[in-house]
Design a protein with these regions (language model features):
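N-terminal, polar/charged subdomain of small-to-medium soluble alpha/beta proteins
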Residues: 2-97, 101, 112-156
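An anionic oxygen-ligand recognition environment, strongly enriched in 2H phosphoesterase
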Residues: 104
Length: 156
């Protein structure tokens, strides 16, 4: 599968975790064990096809240790879990002034649709468990980072 699909700017920040949890005032807490905490940003130009490319990249990215070699196993290889948090602030532009601009981030309606699609398709792709934060709400995210190891991803 080619990762050059469309003209979107979807961004993700992946963090390897031993466990992670998200809670909010509007939903039950969600938690995972060993796997990835995924902060997902959606641009106005993003599509379901671009989200699918990001999913493919995430589940096959070899960032987990195995056997005697570093970085030779993927999320699928380790039967890992994923916690996905919507994060429009990944599109912060701080190049001017003292207040960030988020003009490249998708409108909430579009971002929520792509976020839901991403989570549903990620779940179908096979990680052990996929949990999600509540879109559009203030959340408390707790993570026990492993490494620490964080990887920014962009699908152009």
């Amino acid at each position: 599968m080619s990762l050059q699909k469309g003209n979107g700017d979807v961004k993700a920040l992946l963090q390897k975790v031993l466990n992670a949890e998200v809670s909010s005032d509007v939903a039950e807490p969600q938690s995972i064990d060993h796997g990835l905490l995924i902060f997902l940003g959606v641009a106005e130009t993003d599509t379901e096809q671009i989200a699918q490319c990001m999913i493919h990249k995430i589940i096959h990215l070899r960032i987990f240790d195995g056997g005697g070699s570093k970085f030779d196993r993927s999320l699928l290889d380790i039967d890992g879990e994923a916690l996905v948090i919507s994060q429009f602030t990944l599109f912060a532009d701080t190049s001017r002034g003292r207040r960030p601009s988020f003009r490249k981030a998708a409108r909430p309606e579009k971002a929520e649709a792509i976020f839901r699609y991403f989570c549903d398709q990620l779940e179908a792709a096979g990680p052990q468990a996929v949990r999600r934060g509540t879109f559009g709400s203030r959340m408390i995210v707790k993570a026990c980072n492993f490494g620490p190891f964080s990887v920014p991803l962009e699908i152009p």
